Amino acid sequence: MLGYNRLGINGRLGNQMFQYAALRGIAAKHNYDWVIPPLDHTTIPMAEYVLFDGFKMSSVKESNFGFIPQDRPTYDEPSHDFDVNLFNNCPDNINLDGFRQSEKYFKHIEDEIREDFTFKDDIYEPCKEFISQYGCLLYTSDAADDT
């Protein structure tokens, strides 16, 4: 079983999306079960665990909520690059940590991840007309902008 005990601590929504997707992708590659912190967890101070606020997260079942025991190893990322060794050789029964900001961790289960990250109806419905009229909008911020 793989877990991400600090989900909600290492960054906000975008980071949590990558961390969740990477956890799911690595677990799927090795046919491992996986867990994420329960929605009502208060064991981690200052956690901003927001994945379930806006997304349906339809593949998450009750059995997917929990923690990896603290006596199990935690694997932190050595850099912000894709960790091919972790992806190909991940041991079972560990806790993942770090940001895991690469789609390579979950590209093979992209459809499942997209389904989980479907907006909840109360968010999507008010935006539906705008989206159909203008299509998908993408906002990017370039820190090296010369303007």
Model-derived regions: residue spans:
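N-terminal regions that are enriched for targeting/export leaders
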Residues: 2-4
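Short, flexible coil/turn micro-motifs enriched in small/turn-prone residues
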Residues: 6-9, 93
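A short, glycine/small-residue-rich beta-strand->loop->alpha-helix junction that serves as a flexible
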Residues: 8-18
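Histidine-anchored nucleotide/phosphate-binding helix
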Residues: 19-27
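N-terminal cationic-hydrophobic initiation segments that often serve targeting/anchoring roles
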Residues: 27-28, 138
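Glycine-rich cofactor/substrate-binding loops
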Residues: 32-105
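Mid-sequence helix-capping/hinge segment at a functional interface
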Residues: 106-138
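Single conserved hydrophobic/aromatic residue that forms the stacking wall/gate
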Residues: 139-147
